[in-house]
């Protein structure tokens, strides 16, 4: 069974993330969406909330599992009994960052492999940061995130 781990903050999950999850689920037998817990970072949603939001928008994808993790990704991979990291790339700067991270992960565990998927053209401009910024200024985020979570984002932004 080929299992890939798709790690990220997903704060919040975007249509770009969801696209990578759906496409990854067609390539791999199982995709584990790994929601990063970083106590040093300020998030819009707590990790448990991010897990629930992702579960809500992926409920119809049978071979997707959502989990949170902290610590080194290579250790989480071992826990998941896989060596494959799935990453989405939007821009050249994403590539440069993920290229470096792939080498770091390979240095930490030589069995680790990173598989990158190019973003779909319709999602190349979407990032969680952009979603939050647009929402904070009252803009329409309906084309940026799954419809099921728009109210969650807007109510959190407007606290």
Swiss-Prot record:
The record's subcellular locations are:
Cytoplasm
User: InterPro entries in the record, alphabetically?
Assistant: Cyt_trans-like, PPAT, Rossmann-like_a/b/a_fold
Keyword Manganese carried by entry: no
Its Gene Ontology biological processes? Answer: coenzyme A biosynthetic process
Asked whether the UniProt record includes Nucleotide-binding among its keywords, one would answer yes
Please write the reaction equations for the catalytic activity of this protein: (R)-4'-phosphopantetheine + ATP + H(+) = 3'-dephospho-CoA + diphosphate
Which pathway, metabolic or otherwise, does it act in?
A: Cofactor biosynthesis; coenzyme A biosynthesis; CoA from (R)-pantothenate: step 4/5
The residues that hold ATP are: 9-10, 17, 88-90, 98, 123-129
Which residues are recorded as binding substrate?
9, 41, 73, 87
Domain of life, source organism: Bacteria
The Gene Ontology CC terms held by the record are: cytoplasm
- Which Pfam families does this chain map to? CTP_transf_like (PF01467)
**Cofactor or coenzyme needed:** Mg(2+)
What keyword terms does UniProt attach to this protein? ATP-binding, Coenzyme A biosynthesis, Cytoplasm, Magnesium, Nucleotide-binding, Nucleotidyltransferase, Transferase
The molecular function terms in GO held by this entry are: ATP binding; pantetheine-phosphate adenylyltransferase activity
Q: What is its EC number?
A: 2.7.7.3
Q: Which Gene3D superfamilies match?
A: HUPs (3.40.50.620)
The site (Transition state stabilizer) lies at 17
Briefly state the protein's biological role: Reversibly transfers an adenylyl group from ATP to 4'-phosphopantetheine, yielding dephospho-CoA (dPCoA) and pyrophosphate.
In the record, the note on similarity to other proteins reads:
Belongs to the bacterial CoaD family.
- What quaternary structure, including any partners, is listed in this protein's UniProt entry? Homohexamer.
Output this protein's name. Phosphopantetheine adenylyltransferase
